[in-house]
Amino acid sequence: MERVITAKANYLAGLGYEVFILTTDQQGRAPFFALDSSIGLIDLDVNYDAVDTSSRLRKYVGLAKHKRLHRERLERKLKELALDITISTGYQDFSFLPSLKDGSIKITESHGSWGKTVSEYRFPQTDYVRRLISKWDEYAFARRASRYACTVLLTHEDAELWGDRLAHVEVIHNLMPISSEQVATLDAKRCIAVARFAHEKNLRGTLDVWAKVVRTHPDWRLDIYGEGYLHDQLVRQMKELGIESSCALHKPTAEITSEYLSSSILLMTSQTEGLPMVLLEAQELGLPSVCYAFHCGAKDVLLEAATPCGFVVPYGDEDAFAERLEELMRDADLRKRMGQAARQNASRFYADVVLPKWDALFRSLVSSKK
């Protein structure tokens, strides 16, 4: 998220906007990405990281105190700055920003999706408690978002899923996170997955699919890059499926671009996403992708492309996923056609396409207020 916010702030500053970034837990650390010298960086010194989490009671009491301090300091600073527009990135200030009396237009941008907020479709009908919590999360998000002048979502699919429960929605995609002059040759008999080893990334599903296809394609291999609490479970699953010789788990690497370039197909079996950077990176490097129809991102990236650059299959249909994957494994010409289309599709997410939409939104909101 910091990369996206930095790119947006630098672009707007270049257009002549007066831009401020307000943080809560900076604690003297310099920004990771370079900011335009005209941008004001202000830390409110709330320090949510200091909340005592040793028990639920201490956590909730501490969080309430910190949020009260956050609200007081933020309102004071916004009145001092007298801004035209204030944006919430959807964290602690999301619940109270619209109620601050500083005179600015309030916007919220969601870096998640309906699928992340409303997870009931993953729970069995008999799991009443979790389904009830899911319904409450959906209601709470929609109620809070409706208090903003505009909610910016990452995908058209997400906007359709929320429907009329959210007022004044704009869709602005994430920026392409990388830039490369090179593209993959797609000659290597190698698939790649890049994800945290966490339940929502559903790498167990990736391994199940791989076990199906590697029987008839023993000369192919799968390399998975990431880390997380499910590492040992995934290792055990690989052994149980008998795929250790064709599949490996790797720690995250700073040279991930090189790993994409030496691969031929990206696999994604996530349960939920916002707009996955991994999928955008694959587009830039010319990799065709096979994805489940998770909420959200795969449909906006792959199905809205001018030319097919991958496959999106029904969520959880391992046979359909394996069939599409084998189609790409067998047909080098198809891989390369889709790879070329992916590279062309990448331009939809370039800064010169995405960032002007923010400028247009701000101008529209300010003019409508006058």
Residue locations for each model-derived region?
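Membrane-proximal helix-turn-helix segments that form the acceptor-binding/catalytic region
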Residues: 73-76, 129-150
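A short, well-ordered alpha-helix in the C-terminal region of glycosyltransferases
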Residues: 320, 327, 334-348, 357-360
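Conserved acidic donor-binding segment of nucleotide-sugar-dependent glycosyltransferases
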Residues: 303-319, 327-332
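Conserved donor-binding/catalytic core segment of Leloir-type glycosyltransferases
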Residues: 183-210
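Active-site proximal beta-strand in glycosyltransferases
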Residues: 85-87, 100-121, 131, 152
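N-terminal strand-loop element at the rim of the active site
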Residues: 11, 17-61, 161
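Aromatic "clamp/platform" in nucleotide-sugar-dependent glycosyltransferases that forms part
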Residues: 252, 271
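Carbohydrate-associated surface elements
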Residues: 157, 175
